Amino acid sequence: MVLFGALMGLVTPFNQSLMIAFCCINASFFGWAQYESIAFTQLGVPQQDLGFSGGLAGMARYAGGSLAQAIYTTILTNTQTTRAAATVPAAAVRAGMSLENAQALLAALPLGAAAIAEVPGTTAEALGAASLAFQWSYAHALKVVALSSLSFGIVGLLCIFYCEDLTPKMTDKVEVFLENDVYADKNEFH
């Protein structure tokens, strides 16, 4: 998951198929990691602590997800805005627009075709150059987000070394039976 998350940093405006493949592979590993976390939650604690353990695991997952989303969104927004402010007007100026109109085009790009049409001096060449620079600014921001995910992944990989080995607990023994089961009397707690 760490590897394919970091490989998302290879994004360009022209390699959509490769990025879709990396997203699918990364999502597969993410799903596998969810099952692993459930196994550690359920098998790593005594029977009477299952509810508490599951609650803490769920809370940690939701809190971690919220924190990661806030961090990644902040990185994406700030990096893309900074990069677009530097590259979009420069690309439009190289394509023949004045600097003032290029700045107006930068402000109009996220607003759609109607806003772009109102910018004076906009030509097809300038619009094409500015649009490509805008796409590259997003690609750059996504690259920074993908590389920043490495820090979380490396910390997670280091935490794996401190996890309990669950192999001795992977047996045929059933810890808890349903109360209406014929083996309900084997339950330690009722």
List the predicted regions and their residue ranges:
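Transmembrane-helix exit segments and adjacent C-terminal regions of multi-pass membrane proteins
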Residues: 109-190
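C-terminal module of multi-pass small-molecule transporters
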Residues: 1-93, 142-163
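Extracellular/lumenal N-termini and interhelical loops of multi-pass eukaryotic membrane proteins
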Residues: 75-130
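Short, surface-exposed, polar/charged, turn-prone segments marking secondary-structure boundaries
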Residues: 36, 83, 98-103, 172-177, ...
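Charged/polar, solvent-exposed surface patches and flexible loops
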Residues: 8, 86, 104, 132, ...
